[in-house]
Amino acid sequence: MKTFSESHKTVFVVDHCPYMSESCRQHVEFDMLTKNRTQGIIPLAPISKSLWTCAVEASMEYCRIMYDIFPFRKLVNFIVSDSRSRTLNSWNREDQNLQELMAALAVIGPPNPRADPECCSILHGLVEAVESLCKITDFQHESRTALMGNADWVANRGRIICITNAKSDSHVQMLEDCVNETIHEHNKMAAGSDHLMQIQKCHLVLLHTYPVGEDSLVSDRPKKELSNVLVSEVHSVKAGRHLSTKLNQLVQLHFDLASTTITNIPMKPTLSVCDQEEQHANTSANYDVELLHHKEAHVDFIKSGEGYTGSSSIRENSLKETVTLKWCTPRTNSVELHYCTGAFRISPVDVNSRPSSCLTNFLLNGRSVLLEQPRKSGSKVISHMLSSHGGEIFLHVLSSSRSILEDPPSISEGCGGRVTDYRITDFGEFMRENRLMPFPEQSYQMDGGPEVPLERAKEQLERHTRYWPMIISQTTIFNMQAVVPLASVIVKESLSEEDLLNCQKTIYNLVDMERKNDPLPISTAGTRGKGPKRDEQYRIMWNELETLVRAHVSGSERHQRVMECLMACRSKPPEEEERKKRGRKREDKEEKGEKLNKDHEHDKKGQESERIKSVLDQEKEDLAEAEVIKDSPDSPEPPNKKPHIVIEDTGPAEKSKGPMSLLSLWSSRINTANSRKHQEFVGRLNSVNNKAELYQHLKEENGGEGVENGKASRQ
């Protein structure tokens, strides 16, 4: 069936009876000059609009927004009702514009307060509205012609918006009954006509408007289905700006519109004569403009998940949230912008305000405005752009994240491009076990009732996901092949005796692994050192296994027996605990021994480095003294001696047991160099500041005299 929604046809029925000429009692200041007033001049009194004027203005605003955003395929038929009904336009495309409607309303004029109210009724307009809905529009005629013999496949739906001043709830009910009966009568007439269409669905919206300050005689009522054809709802609204706000909310609901508020629009403020003397003319202020558009302009924005919740707010007198976007002046070329994923027509909410008109003229002159999401931190994100095409303004949606032309991201690509260890293989197996397929045979539950296959599939999916870690590093038991027999059957709705034995056997195997101190596949990612000790690893494993079994313990009696077996194996006997303590003490001793060996090696290396340093200093001193003796004229030439090699100092070369350290290489080099030198003189070894006293043994034997006589006799 070719579906035309209820928004395809909208019929406005406005009451033109004498009581609609009553004042709405909402005053409007007519004389706005409050400063520099000449003395003696009495200010003009405030004015107020009639109920008719408020109804016409609000309905025209509804039509303006609809025509701005949907210039095609959304049609309006305007009817006024007093002593008779008068249709101001038709469903033809040339009549679908505000100029035609306003010209027709000007001809009608305001209601006559002196007319006889008994002769006027809103029922004339409602009957005419039902008759208008039965007429075929150009779009419906094109669809019926294209379908040829299947013209009945084209649906006919519509909406009636009635603005009146009802007397009571019973009066409203009478209007609804009249519309319902009229629809059934006209459907019978349309069944035998080629120029009319039966109404499949009609949405009646009754707006009871009354002056400000009075009590409403009609109560609100949400949408209610009166028959298989008619759905009705009632709104009781004060006249004036309250009625305009209500119709603004309804147009958003009826046509799936969303609101976007553009903030920080730079614009010079409008100043009065007295204000211009106080404020410089070149100053500027930031203004806000609210725009309406189709809600699909926010779909990608909401999917991205960034900035939407923080940038949305509820405006005063507004039905829905409005998304706030900031005026942006980027320093980039238009070529560097992201791809445009959609363009939607816009309509300003307050079309007559100066900020709205300035923004509209700015865009119609060929300029574009980039809009960014307000963010507390980080770089700006340009998500939308305003631009005009062919005299119409569009809100363009820019791709603010990954381009739709790129390949989709990998399943293992997390936030910021970080690759995480998802259980991709296990998830593929999980999908195979829970895939949907046709269910050929009817099954029954335990109580005899039929079992719905979809509900059975949901229950199985719920059991399989009670405990299912998504990341490899967050689980131990799902990385162990020994736990697979238990993990694969514990998720069943009921266990057989064989399944119970397999689960118990798996638990006993884990106990045996713990007794043998076998290693477990514990992830040490992000940790320093060796990770948790062996008994700590098994404690983590047992806790996770208990979590898995406890999630399914209420499934059946055998599930409970698996849990009892697990708890019995976890409660170790005293000798087992004593063995564990001894094992922990042995591990602590081994760790302390390794630490002492490392400290001893470190001290040994320090002593070796000190010894090498002293030997190097001694070599430097020997070289300096040799240079002094050689340069002295009295010193004879030293005989050429073959270097004496001390064999006992050079032991057999040890075989390298691996890569040698720098200290070992340097020590080997120094030992080799020292072994090739002759034995040092005793006097030089015992010298002080490289000065050795000669004939010291004579002095010790004969005293100081012998030395002096010896010196004198030499002279």
UniProtKB/Swiss-Prot annotation:
This is Integrator complex subunit 13. It holds the Pfam family Mat89Bb. The cleavage module binding motif (CMBM) mediates recruitment of transcription factors. A motif (Nuclear localization signal (NLS)) lies at residues 581-591. Component of the integrator complex, a multiprotein complex that terminates RNA polymerase II (Pol II) transcription in the promoter-proximal region of genes. Belongs to the Integrator subunit 13 family. Component of the Integrator complex, composed of core subunits INTS1, INTS2, INTS3, INTS4, INTS5, INTS6, INTS7, INTS8, INTS9/RC74, INTS10, INTS11/CPSF3L, INTS12, INTS13, INTS14 and INTS15. The core complex associates with protein phosphatase 2A subunits PPP2CA and PPP2R1A, to form the Integrator-PP2A (INTAC) complex. INTS13 is part of the tail subcomplex, composed of INTS10, INTS13, INTS14 and INTS15. GO terms for biological process: cell division; centrosome localization; flagellated sperm motility; regulation of fertilization; regulation of mitotic cell cycle; RNA polymerase II transcription initiation surveillance. Residues 658-703 are annotated as: Cleavage module binding motif (CMBM). Residues 572-612, 626-659 are annotated as: Disordered. The keyword Cytoplasm applies. It is found in: Nucleus; Cytoplasm. GO terms for cellular component: cytoplasm; INTAC complex; integrator complex; nucleus. It comes from Xenopus laevis. Keywords: Cell cycle, Cell division, Cytoplasm, Developmental protein, Mitosis, Nucleus. The keyword Manganese does not apply. Signal peptide: none annotated. Its main location: nucleus.
